[in-house]
Amino acid sequence: MVLEATMILIDNSEWMINGDYIPTRFEAQKDTVHMIFNQKINDNPENMCGLMTIGDNSPQVLSTLTRDYGKFLSAMHDLPVRGNAKFGDGIQIAQLALKHRENKIQRQRIVAFVGSPIVEDEKNLIRLAKRMKKNNVAIDIIHIGELQNESALQHFIDAANSSDSCHLVSIPPSPQLLSDLVNQSPIGQGVVASQNQFEYGVDPNLDVELALALELSMAEERARQEVAAQKSSEETEDKKMQE
């Protein structure tokens, strides 16, 4: 079991209202963030996760490193979706949050969602990546939506990589859930490999309330996605009839 402290960076820029991922880029990210948090926490009893946003024109730490699912869930409530994303600034702030972790034995990892155009200079990003490597910070990037970012992000990961500890996963729009696709990727495999075979990664015998909360949350998410898919189908049919 890997002992890690992980900062998760969610892109809440205005690009996240796009509906090319089910039901939107932003909601698809949130679903995946929940999955990553629970899998990380269940992978090791001393693992911790923190949460940041990188949109709204300024990165913001929503939750410092914690194992408290309630605190983490509350931090994601009513997040604004606006402005532009500051990827580089977000990485730097996340690294500082990891640097001040209480348990220095924990390995450091950043999991960043990027779903809007990268505005930073690529040379500066590569310098930042090398600094992350020097400070032993592993980075995973979940890239959605904006294909023009892929080259810059790949160069960033290449510069940050050490012993294949960093990953870039670019996921095009798909009828499948983003969380499922991430789960099947190298990022997901790294998280899930040592996980027990309990639904949602939680043993209900150890934490009944958490298992029930996850079950209800996933049921609500599935219902919302079904409504969104039905609405999209009806709108498409109406357009065809009008033509």
Curated annotation (Swiss-Prot):
GO process annotations (BP): mitotic recombination-dependent replication fork processing; proteasome-mediated ubiquitin-dependent protein catabolic process; stalled replication fork localization to nuclear periphery
Superkingdom field: Eukaryota
Cellular component GO terms held in the UniProt record: cytosol; nucleus; proteasome regulatory particle, base subcomplex; proteasome regulatory particle, lid subcomplex
Biased composition (Basic and acidic residues): 232-243
Subcellular location field: Nucleus
Gene label: rpn10
Annotated InterPro entries: PSMD4, UIM_dom, VWF_A, vWFA_dom_sf
One Pfam family of this chain: VWA_2
Domain VWFA intervals: 5-185
Protein known as: 26S proteasome regulatory subunit rpn10
Domain UIM: residue ranges: 205-224
Region Disordered: start-end pairs: 223-243
Key words, A-Z: Nucleus, Proteasome, Ubl conjugation pathway
Principal place of residence: nucleus
Subunit structure: The 26S proteasome is composed of a core protease, known as the 20S proteasome, capped at one or both ends by the 19S regulatory complex (RC). The RC is composed of at least 18 different subunits in two subcomplexes, the base and the lid, which form the portions proximal and distal to the 20S proteolytic core, respectively. Interacts with uch2.
MF terms (GO), sorted A to Z: K48-linked polyubiquitin modification-dependent protein binding
Function: Protects ubiquitin chains against dissambly by deubiquitinating enzymes thereby promoting protein degradation.
Family designation: Belongs to the proteasome subunit S5A family.
